[in-house]
Amino acid sequence: MENVKKTDPTIFSWIEEEWKRQEEGIELIASENFASRAVMEAQGSVLTNKYAEGYPGRRYYGGCQFVDKVEELAISRVKELFNADHANVQPHSGASANMGVYLAALKPGDTVLGMSLDHGGHLTHGSPVNISGKYFNFHHYGILEDTGKIDFDKVRELAKEHKPKMIVAGASAYPRIIDFATFREIADEVGAYLMVDMAHIAGLVAAGLHPNPVPYADFVTTTTHKTLRGPRGGVVLCKEEYKKEIDKAMFPGLQGGPLMHVIASKAVSFQEALSSEFKNYQKQVIKNASVLADELNNLGYDLVAGGSDNHLMLVDLQKKGVTGKKAERVLDDVHITVNKNAVPNDPEGPFVTSGLRLGTPAVTTRGFAEDEIKEVAQLLDKVITGLEDQENLEKCKKQVTDLCHRFPLYRQ
């Protein structure tokens, strides 16, 4: 970073501050992770200089012989990782990947069935404030109040009533295994496409620890960060019959030039994800989430769906008399990063909320195992139950710092 320091000391100083925040804080945001040095180095390479509109062997610019090899390798690796017929690695984000599928398979005004945002879905699954909800006629399913699991009877009922062109499965705050076979069954009953957004669980799927949606879905989208631990970006996987439509939708339909430095970084992360070490890492992610959920249950917290089968959990704070916004802010003060999150039937608005979403991918990358996770659960409880006790918060902050110093990230 010496060149950044010399050229732009202001930006360098903020990068240093962000490094310090990551190094000295406990990261529990479920959608965040720590990329390897190799992933970051590929993203910071000379490939950032190259324009490459089009696809390997079919570019609109010369000089693409090497970036063609990079993109071909990224495609080959991600297809192997998920046993997919076809992959498009050009989406700049998960949202871009989702919009690419919609553009390929739908027309404006088409009816789509997706998971409600306040029941664990995502903005791009038809929220009225998102382009998906403005361009398409979305209807939403949710979870059962007693179990917190997807209400498949309601999914089937809505599908038969509205005859959607597409059903979207996948979530951003759902802690249980998703039954893709039942989604496929319902989609077939009404003649709908099935799209699965596996952004949150892609790493678990790659490791064989969550059912793979690829055999069931017509289209699968994912981010490449989160549990995959790559750079920020997206991917679309699809059956061979949809290859042409997907590629045409991503370029020239939705995007211009691909980010070749990011695609190189994706390729590196896919190589990492094919390793046995990555599978062991994902096993620990799930163990840590299970331990954290159990510890919080034992401390008297209400968890949506009662616990976790994957990398995340949703904590309902209503019985604790604390809003998600307040808990997030005070936890941030002691260097524990979480995100406030709506819970089902939340009486609070989206900027306040009654819950927290917690995840274990980042702390597991750091090296935390069961003992450290138990300590984290105790810290969460001490902060949430002692929000106004400044002495308590200072002690918690020191405990967080000491714990993080035992597990350094990028600088030994």
UniProtKB/Swiss-Prot annotation:
GO terms for molecular function: glycine hydroxymethyltransferase activity; pyridoxal phosphate binding. PROSITE patterns: SHMT. It is found in: Cytoplasm. It catalyses: (6R)-5,10-methylene-5,6,7,8-tetrahydrofolate + glycine + H2O = (6S)-5,6,7,8-tetrahydrofolate + L-serine. (6S)-5,6,7,8-tetrahydrofolate binds at L117, G121, H122, L123. Its main location: cytoplasm. Its EC number is 2.1.2.1. GO terms for biological process: glycine biosynthetic process from serine; tetrahydrofolate interconversion. InterPro entries: PyrdxlP-dep_Trfase, PyrdxlP-dep_Trfase_major, PyrdxlP-dep_Trfase_small, Ser_HO-MeTrfase, Ser_HO-MeTrfase-like, Ser_HO-MeTrfase_PLP_BS, SHMT-like_dom. GO terms for cellular component: cytosol. Pfam families: SHMT. Pathway: One-carbon metabolism; tetrahydrofolate interconversion; Amino-acid biosynthesis; glycine biosynthesis; glycine from L-serine: step 1/1. Keywords: Amino-acid biosynthesis, Cytoplasm, One-carbon metabolism, Pyridoxal phosphate, Transferase. The modification N6-(pyridoxal phosphate)lysine is found at K226. Its cofactor is pyridoxal 5'-phosphate. Belongs to the SHMT family. NCBIfam families: PRK00011.1. PANTHER family: SERINE HYDROXYMETHYLTRANSFERASE (PTHR11680), SERINE HYDROXYMETHYLTRANSFERASE 1 (PTHR11680:SF35). Catalyzes the reversible interconversion of serine and glycine with tetrahydrofolate (THF) serving as the one-carbon carrier. This reaction serves as the major source of one-carbon groups required for the biosynthesis of purines, thymidylate, methionine, and other important biomolecules. Also exhibits THF-independent aldolase activity toward beta-hydroxyamino acids, producing glycine and aldehydes, via a retro-aldol mechanism. This is Serine hydroxymethyltransferase. It comes from Natranaerobius thermophilus (strain ATCC BAA-1301 / DSM 18059 / JW/NM-WN-LF). The lineage of its organism: Bacteria, Bacillati, Bacillota, Clostridia, Natranaerobiales.
